[in-house]
Amino acid sequence: MKEQKWIHEGLITESLPNGMFRVRLDNEDMILGYVSGKIRRSFIRILPGDRVKIEVSRYDSTRGRIIYRLRNKDSKD
C-alpha cells in the first residue's frame, strides 16, 4: 500500500547545500525541503522567494520533497 502524503504550499526562505531548502509553509511551519528528481533532471531553478508545492510524509513532518515551483506573477519565465 502506498504511503499517504500531505501536499502543502510554501515559500523558500533559505537555500542550503545539495539541493536542500528551508521552506515556510502557509501554516507558518518551517520545514526542510529537498528537490525531487524530475525537477532536478529538468534543470528547474529554485531560488529564495519562490513559491513551491511540497509533499510531506505523515511520519516525518520536518522534511518534505519539493514537487512543483509555482510561477511568480512578476517574473517573465
Curated annotation (Swiss-Prot):
The keyword Secreted does not apply. Residues 1-71 form the S1-like domain. It comes from the Eukaryota. InterPro entries: NA-bd_OB-fold, RNA-binding_domain_S1_IF1, S1_domain, TIF_IF1. Its main location: plastid. Gene3D superfamilies: Nucleic acid-binding proteins (2.40.50.140). SMART domains: S1. It is found in: Plastid, Chloroplast. The keyword Chloroplast applies. Keywords: Chloroplast, Initiation factor, Plastid, Protein biosynthesis, RNA-binding, rRNA-binding. One of its GO terms (cellular component) is chloroplast. GO terms for molecular function: ribosome binding; rRNA binding; translation initiation factor activity. Coiled coil: none annotated. Belongs to the IF-1 family. One of the essential components for the initiation of protein synthesis. Stabilizes the binding of IF-2 and IF-3 on the 30S subunit to which N-formylmethionyl-tRNA(fMet) subsequently binds. Helps modulate mRNA selection, yielding the 30S pre-initiation complex (PIC). Upon addition of the 50S ribosomal subunit IF-1, IF-2 and IF-3 are released leaving the mature 70S translation initiation complex. Component of the 30S ribosomal translation pre-initiation complex which assembles on the 30S ribosome in the order IF-2 and IF-3, IF-1 and N-formylmethionyl-tRNA(fMet); mRNA recruitment can occur at any time during PIC assembly. This is Translation initiation factor IF-1, chloroplastic. The lineage of its organism: Eukaryota, Viridiplantae, Streptophyta, Embryophyta, Tracheophyta.
